[in-house]
Design a protein with these regions (language model features):
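Catalytic metal-binding/acid-base residues of hydrolase active sites
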Residues: 5, 14-15, 29-30, 50-52, ...
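Generic structural signal for secondary-structure transition and capping sites
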Residues: 8, 29, 92-95
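Active-site neighborhood of glycoside hydrolase catalytic domains
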Residues: 1-23, 41, 82
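Short secondary-structure transition/capping segments
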Residues: 22-24, 110-111
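Substrate-binding clefts and catalytic carboxylate motifs of secreted carbohydrate-active enzymes
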Residues: 35-130
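Hydrophobic faces of well-ordered beta-strands that scaffold small-molecule active sites
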Residues: 9-11, 24-26, 44-47, 99
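Alpha-helical scaffolding within the catalytic cores
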Residues: 13, 26-40
Length: 130
């Protein structure tokens, strides 16, 4: 805050909330997506959600994986779209922001919108992502 007081502070993204900073930040992969009202009036952000795993053979870095499985890009896309609609519906309830996990696959997590080598879009049209 000393360096740039104009930037909001998320003091502990997704970890135990110490009631500090400007954002009430949660990571939510398992529970129903809801907006929590912060007693201090901080902005509520779901700073990680999603995690739908979809391995594309030939475009992974390891054999192991972690996530919530969609077997094919054909099953990945509808699950992703449903999740996006659920997030959109939370804006009117006070959701200030949301961060999908994640843009591209990483080592043991094949839950990106793009594969590890970033050559395969997992069935989502560019205008849908935008």
């Amino acid at each position: 805050r000393q360096e740039d007081p104009s930037r909001p502070v998320d003091h502990a993204s997704g970890w135990f909330d110490q009631k500090a900073g400007d954002i009430c930040s949660v990571h939510n992969y398992f529970r129903d997506l809801v907006v929590e009202k912060d007693p201090a009036g901080r902005a509520f952000v779901i700073s990680e959600y999603g995690g739908i795993t979809c391995r594309v053979p030939g475009h992974v870095s390891t054999e192991g994986t972690y996530g919530y499985h969609a077997e094919t890009t054909e099953t990945f896309a509808p699950r992703f779209h449903a999740l996006m609609e659920e997030i959109r519906s939370l804006r009117e309830k006070g959701l200030a922001g949301a961060v999908y996990t994640q843009v591209s696959d990483i080592e043991e997590e094949d839950n990106g919108l793009l594969t590890y080598d970033r050559t395969v879009n997992k069935g989502l049209l560019t205008d849908t992502i935008n």
